[in-house]
Design a protein with these regions (language model features):
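Membrane-embedded beta-strand positions of outer-membrane beta-barrel proteins
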Residues: 28-32, 70-72, 129-133, 159, ...
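Transmembrane beta-strands of outer-membrane beta-barrel pores
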Residues: 32-38, 74-78, 122, 135-139, ...
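Outer-membrane beta-barrel translocator domains and adjoining extracellular loop/strand segments
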Residues: 40-46, 81-87, 141-148, 184-190, ...
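Residues on the lipid-exposed face of transmembrane beta-strands in outer-membrane beta-barrel proteins
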Residues: 55-61, 114-120, 157-163, 225-231, ...
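Outer-membrane beta-barrel channels and translocator barrels
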Residues: 63-66, 122-125, 164-168, 232-234, ...
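Outer-membrane beta-barrel "beta-signal"
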Residues: 167, 474-486
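Long, internal scaffold/assembly segments composed of regular secondary structure
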Residues: 205-349
Length: 486
């Protein structure tokens, strides 16, 4: 399954119509998993301890003449002692405008992810058409006052077309539309005690409030597109994809009397190149990715107009008050020793670079980080028994992240707020820490019956992340999963 997905270059892209050019072997799987991590080396909004239990399924098949792929996953994620978030499900999704409080709290989160792809067969004129749909939803609940019930939804549609120029060259085009919405409602279970909270406006700038919080409505859209080029010879496969999309999302206070508070304009450009070569004895895989993401943080000035013609909040002015820019580049190389439809062993290496610079324009504040990551790993696929196709896959890997530069400087008012002293300072310390990771996994698999195609597997993995920077120590991760491929 692992090697099959690596060879399907169009399935890795944003173009569903190109599935016709991939290996069209039918496959499906069902996986149940449990993941646990703890330790003090984490971002301030993450839990000191996090446990996740989930189930996922994926499948690909021919439905008459059409090609169809689909997947579904559900996760129940429990966070313990998470801080500095009292507003949204994911504080790392590129939305700087949310609410924090001074108490660490447990969270109970649920995530649903449903995806499908469909493609026509290759027509006589060399064209194929496809579509991808994605629906994601999450429900999150903070367990300590001020409590939060937040619900996030996104619906994405990606129509696509591809054209076979000749046996070796293919071109593709895909367009993307995505609708985004999140409803956040705060309240105090103990109404006798008011709680302090802070409305974030970027890099530590905040407005303090007291009481039970507020309701916040996040809504927006994302538009974009991608171009693909595929070269397929008898030996080499080369795949190039360039994509660009723009997300515009607004933040409104209150549902009964909406007040436009802030918004973002998020632009992302990505260019990737993938090559795959399968020889008689060895296979090679190389993937390079460059990503640039720029977010403009927009703030609104509004006044309440209770005239008969309006009776609501009127926007007087809006301006870009903060910017968030991230550049990332990575190169991943894999060498495999072939053994029939599987591999005997695999060696992997990766080099990744990232540079982030966030700025609040006036009064000026800045948070930046520049890092480089080295990764090496190896896998050995042992034949435990030829009968029932018994295998034991051993995986060992190690990573090292080196910080090249970084800082956090706050120039605004109220430097004593926890948004400055705790949230942004701790986050900058995490981003600018050196760390190392050592880990491995064992996967045992075998056929359920000698004459059946169903393959059962169980996997256990462990990773240790260590550091001594900024009074951090470690983060340990344990995962156990079981499932079947058929």
């Amino acid at each position: 399954m692992e090697q099959l997905k690596m060879q399907r270059l169009w399935l890795q892209s944003q173009n569903a119509s190109g599935m016709v050019f991939d290996d069209t072997t039918r496959f499906s799987n069902l996986v149940m998993n449990y993941h646990l991590q703890d330790g003090n080396f984490h971002r301030p909004q993450e839990g000191a301890k996090e446990s996740t239990i989930g189930v996922s399924s994926e499948g690909f098949m021919k439905l008459k003449k059409a090609l169809v792929w689909g997947s579904f996953s559900f996760q129940q994620r429990n966070l313990s002692n998470a801080g500095y978030n009292a507003s949204i499900t994911d504080p790392f999704r590129g939305m700087p405008y949310y609410i924090i409080d001074e108490h660490q709290s447990d969270w109970r989160n649920q995530y649903y992810d449903l995806r499908f792809r469909a493609s026509t067969p290759l027509m006589d004129n060399g064209l194929s058409f496809g579509v991808e749909g994605v629906y994601q939803a999450s429900l999150s609940a903070k367990q300590r006052d001020p409590r939060v019930d937040t619900r996030f939804y996104t619906l994405k549609m990606v129509p696509s077309i591809s054209y076979q120029v000749n046996e070796a060259h293919r071109l593709g085009l895909s367009l993307r539309y995505e609708s985004i919405k999140e409803d956040s409602r705060m309240e105090n279970e103990n109404s006798d005690i008011d709680q302090n909270y802070y409305l974030l406006y970027g890099l530590g700038t905040a407005v303090q409030g007291i009481g039970s919080g507020r309701t916040t409505n996040y809504y927006g859209d994302r538009w974009g597109g991608a171009l693909q080029y595929h070269f397929d010879s008898s030996v080499w496969n080369l795949f190039v994809e360039g994509s660009y999309d723009v997300r515009a999302e607004n933040v409104e206070q209150s549902f009964t009397s909406p007040k436009k508070d802030a918004g973002v304009k998020d632009k992302t450009f990505q260019l990737s190149l993938t090559t795959y070569r399968k020889g008689n004895h060895y296979s090679q895989y190389l993937k390079t990715i460059y990503t640039n993401r720029h977010i403009d943080g927009i703030q609104y000035v509004s006044k309440y107009d209770n005239s008969e013609s309006l009776d609501g909040w009127e926007v007087l002015h809006k301006s870009i008050r903060s910017t968030y820019n991230t550049n990332q580049a990575s190169v991943h190389y894999t060498l495999m020793r072939n053994r029939g439809n599987e591999y005997n062993w695999k060696l992997e290496t990766e080099l990744a670079y990232s540079k982030q610079k966030d700025q609040y324009i006036l009064p000026y504040s800045v948070k930046s980080s520049e890092n480089i990551l080295f990764h090496v790993g190896g896998k050995k696929n042992l034949i435990v028994g030829k009968k029932m196709n018994k295998r034991l896959l051993i995986d060992l890997h190690a990573s090292y992240k080196k910080n090249l530069s970084g800082e956090y400087r706050y120039g605004g008012s109220h430097p004593e707020y926890i948004s400055v002293t705790k949230l942004e300072t701790s986050d900058a310390n995490y981003l600018n820490s050196d760390w190392h990771r050592i880990g491995g996994s064992l996967t045992y698999s075998q056929m359920i019956k000698a004459d059946a195609k169903t393959n059962f597997f169980v996997k256990a993995s462990y990773d240790h992340v260590g550091t001594s920077d900024f009074n951090y120590n470690q983060r340990n991760q344990l995962s156990i999963s079981a499932g079947c491929n058929f």
